[in-house]
Regions:
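Amphipathic alpha-helical packing segments from all-alpha helical-bundle domains
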Residues: 60-61, 77-84, 88-89, 108-133, ...
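C-terminal alpha-helix
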Residues: 127, 177-185
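Hydrophobic/aromatic-rich alpha-helical bundle segments in the mid-to-C-terminal region
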Residues: 98, 102, 110, 114, ...
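Short hydrophobic clusters on alpha-helical segments that form packing/core surfaces
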Residues: 5, 9-13, 59, 86, ...
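Helix-turn-helix
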Residues: 4, 8, 12-46, 50
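Hydrophobic alpha-helical connector segments
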Residues: 50, 64-92, 147, 172
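Short linear capping/connector segments at secondary-structure termini
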Residues: 65-69, 100-107
């Protein structure tokens, strides 16, 4: 029943947005009574928390897996593949990303997004520390922070804005140039 409610909550959030998200709508979408919903979740905030937690967890898993699979690689191909994995993870549910990034009050997803950034940043810092000879940046943790936030923000804006002048391949090329230029400067 919990899975059904969470799936319905995700659907309601995407279809109606944050402002119209309610336990009654979620219960209707789940095909249960509001009373049944309250047996599992005390309020709409609890449902939102699970939906948002799972969303960022899904994104984190995809990106961490892509980075882990390429940990032995170095150079433009690795950057491109990892950025491509991030784009794919964000595109997997573009509409939920839109609601999470643009409609939810910042406090609702800040901690979860920060956890994703921290996880990827730690992997990137470890990766850069193991390849100090391949970069001119003195501190792997600082370099990882800059690279992860730059790539993440570019990816999110591209997925949400879908700029006609910037194709996916063009964006990936620019990300590779940005990261490569920064790490080698």
């Amino acid at each position: 029943m919990v899975e059904r409610i969470v799936a319905a909550g995700r659907g309601v959030l995407v279809e109606h947005g944050y402002d119209a998200f309610s336990t009654n709508r979620v219960a209707t979408a789940a095909g249960i009574s509001p009373g049944s919903l309250y047996q599992y979740f005390p309020d709409k905030a609890a449902i939102l928390d699970v939906v948002i937690d799972r969303y960022w967890e899904e994104v984190a898993e995809r990106v961490a897996a892509a980075l882990s699979e390429r940990i032995a690689d170095f150079g433009p191909g690795m950057v491109r593949d990892t950025a491509d994995a991030l784009l794919s993870a964000l595109e997997a549910d573009r509409e939920l990303l839109r609601v999470v990034a643009e409609e939810l009050p910042i406090h609702r997803s800040r901690e979860r997004r920060a956890a994703l950034e921290r996880r990827v940043r730690e992997l990137a810092a470890t990766y850069l520390a193991a390849r100090r000879e391949s970069t001119r940046r003195p501190d792997p943790a600082t370099a990882a922070w800059v690279v992860v936030l730059a790539v993440e923000n570019l990816a999110m804006r591209w997925v949400l804005d879908q700029p006609a002048a910037v194709t996916r391949d063009a964006l990936l090329d620019e990300m590779v140039a940005l990261v490569g230029g920064y790490l080698l400067a």
